[in-house]
Regions:
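ATP-dependent adenylation/nucleotidyltransferase module used to activate substrates
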Residues: 2-226, 230
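Conserved S-adenosyl-L-methionine
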Residues: 234-240
């Protein structure tokens, strides 16, 4: 179901109580569509911790899947070990080998992808990097990222492929082998790409090439923090700054 940015703004303004109800409704809808053959993507971070708690309130048998890249903070790994029914995955290749072959992820996945494509002469990514991309109204696109043009001359390879091989590839393989469909804790407010994904597919992307549920997409970070404070559920302290939590007392 396609939405608008205005729809997202309205939903982001809902009360936390309403957001909880709608998110759990979306989780149940996803669970029933695939006869329970689903899983939550669990990193040990605050967003996926809230997602797992919401999901297991309505569907207690949902497994969580954690990709152990070897790069996480020990505190996060220790926290993941406290949860029941968690499936641990590992990437096929070590981090150093992936960096050597594909390059470093710089600033963000989105920026790394633009730099990599621009270096290959791809017109769309060059336009974004030069600040020349226009939207459908002929105005300067919000997807321009000319502030990072200097990275074109960086003396090392830059790529977003690192994230794919370290996290996405193990999850994709698990999906194919298990037949389960993912529920993720991403928030639309975290990036333009995630916002566009929600606008195009909504919370439950049944029609995606890779079906994906993102029932927290319309939440804000302050909602996540309020939920942790309100419920008192355990979380990894390293994933939440002391300043942020005090602000929501």
């Amino acid at each position: 179901m396609k939405h608008t940015r205005q729809d997202l703004n309205i939903m982001q303004g809902w009360s936390l109580e309403k957001k909880i109800k709608v998110s759990q409704m979306k989780i149940l809808e996803w669970y029933r569509e695939y006869n329970g053959q689903v899983f939550t993507s669990f990193s040990g971070g605050k967003d996926s911790t809230v997602l797992l708690d919401l999901a297991r309130q309505v569907c207690p048998d949902i497994p969580a899947v954690y990709v152990d890249t070897g790069l996480e903070y020990p505190e996060l790994r220790d926290f993941v070990k406290t949860k029941d029914n968690v499936i641990w995955l590992r990437p096929r290749y070590p981090f150093t080998q992936i960096l050597e072959k594909y390059g470093y992820p710089i600033i963000s996945k989105e920026v790394s992808d633009v730099i990599n494509g621009a270096r290959k002469g791809q017109p769309y990514r060059l336009a974004r990097l030069n600040g020349e991309l226009l939207d459908k109204n002929g105005k300067k696109s919000i997807y321009n990222c000319e502030n990072y043009k200097y990275l074109l001359d960086a003396p090392f390879k830059i790529s977003a492929r690192c994230c794919y091989h370290m996290k996405k590839a193990p999850l994709n393989k698990f999906e194919r082998q298990s037949g389960r469909h993912p529920i993720t804790g991403v928030l639309a407010c975290e990036s333009k790409l995630r916002e566009q994904s929600w606008i195009k597919f909504g919370c439950n992307g049944f029609e995606c090439q890779r079906p994906l549920s993102q029932p927290l997409a319309f939440w804000l970070e302050e909602d996540i923090l309020r939920y942790l404070k309100m419920t008192g559920i355990p979380y990894a302290p390293i994933s939440v700054s002391y300043t942020h939590l005090r602000a929501h007392e």
